Amino acid sequence: MEKVQLLLRQHVGAPCAPCVAVGDKVKKGTLIATPTGLGANIFSSVYGEVSEILEDRIVIKADAEQPDEFVPIDVPEDASKLDMIKAAGIVGMGGAGFPTGIKLNIDLSATEQGEFREDINPELPKDFKLEHSYILINDSECEPGLAHNIKQTIEQTDKVIRGVKYCMEITKADKAIFAIKKKNREAVLKLLDALKDEENISVHLLPDIYPM
């Protein structure tokens, strides 16, 4: 049978700790490793049996039959959206794979702006307050060889926008901006059409330069 090797460090931060043992049967969606610090949950992607646990990976001997069914995420019924994101092990699509549950664990509401830093913004008055709080969606996809962000924007526009709304709800941001290169015409047009009735989500066009 095919062996599947799942690395214990699939993201920025520390390696995860295995929570299964050699000989354990696993299914698609079985939790197999949890963070020891900055990190995200890791799940089995196959039905099979844990055959080895090495320092940097878990090896699973995959079953010949691979049902489509998967194990649901184990969260309480009253779990918040942020708790669900953390439990699901969601990470960013960038190279660092930064854990989304950590990134969104912040209050961006305009009334919670923290301590004024004169060394960072010396030109601003000390009583300065933002009228709005923003989430910036980096859809620029600067690396010349990459296309997955733009592909998802085109093919799953509504899902992407729904995810942005979840992020706004979790962080209490009242505005969101898509930053996308104007050369990606199809993706830009899809976003503009999908957002035509949205007052709080806008599109900002970027020039085609690298690095951005």
Show which residues each predicted segment covers:
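Short beta-strand-turn/beta-hairpin segments enriched in glycine/proline and small hydrophobics
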Residues: 1-14, 41-44
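Short, N-terminal intrinsically disordered low-complexity segments that are rich in Pro/Gly
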Residues: 9-19, 150-153
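Short histidine-centered loop motifs in beta-beta connectors
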Residues: 16-25, 29
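Hydrophobic beta-strand signal
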Residues: 27, 33, 51-52
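Short, charged beta-turn/beta-strand-edge "cap" motif at the junction between a beta-strand
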Residues: 31-40
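Iron-sulfur-associated redox domains of electron-transfer enzymes in respiratory
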Residues: 40-47, 52-212
